Amino acid sequence: MKPQMIPGIITGITAYVASTLIASGVIPMKSFLVLIPVMSITMIVELYRKQEKPFDSLAHTFFSVLYTALPFSMFPFSAFSRTGLNSLLPHPDITFSPGIIIGFFLLIWANDTGAYLTGVSFGRHRLMERISPKKSWEGFFGGVLLAIIVAWFLSGWLGVVDKTHWIIIAVIVSLAGTYGDLIESMLKRSTGVKDSGTIMPGHGGLLDRFDSAIISFPLVYLFLSLFG
């Protein structure tokens, strides 16, 4: 079984580029419809590939797009307005304001750093040993604590949203980011690979640098869209 790598990459790039152009007001929201023929062509191509399990091939191809491209396609909507929600509406004065994205990644790094340092120093109780033997509950709570501290500083430095919102975002990032790590580890184990790619071998692959963001940013975006 071999997924369609090139069509998958094209679909993912198309989704991200369309999101950026829509969020910045260059093209209308209906431009997302361009994904329909792209996905249809992918399914048609599968007819001619003569794979033993075409369903598995298509499932892997489209899941890869859903897992990676969809979350990152939400970043432009957050960067071109205060929370991203306004970019979905007619907005004559759309501005580029990446504060949420900058703060988001700082919180991810704070959570990872806090979890690592606390886990190495005090980790005794395994979080989910069958998936990730090194993760501990002590590390998890250490990551949450450091992320909340950083969120407190971000509220004064970046602003964008108030202190309470930043702290809630920190908790979302810590919880969902941890699940993101575990899900990516689960997927790698299920396919029998150590690294998610040839880039950055020995460190889990390039995807390991973003697995926390894949799960947590859509939830942060949802929170800000509803309550920001």
Predicted ranges, named:
Residues 1-171:
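Membrane-embedded alpha-helical bundles of polytopic integral membrane proteins
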Residues 106-124, 128, 137-141, 175-217:
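Acidic (Asp/Glu-rich) catalytic motifs at the cytosolic membrane interface
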Residues 150-151, 219-221:
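A general structural signal for short secondary-structure boundary/capping elements
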Residues 221-228:
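Juxtamembrane boundary at the C-terminal end of a transmembrane helix
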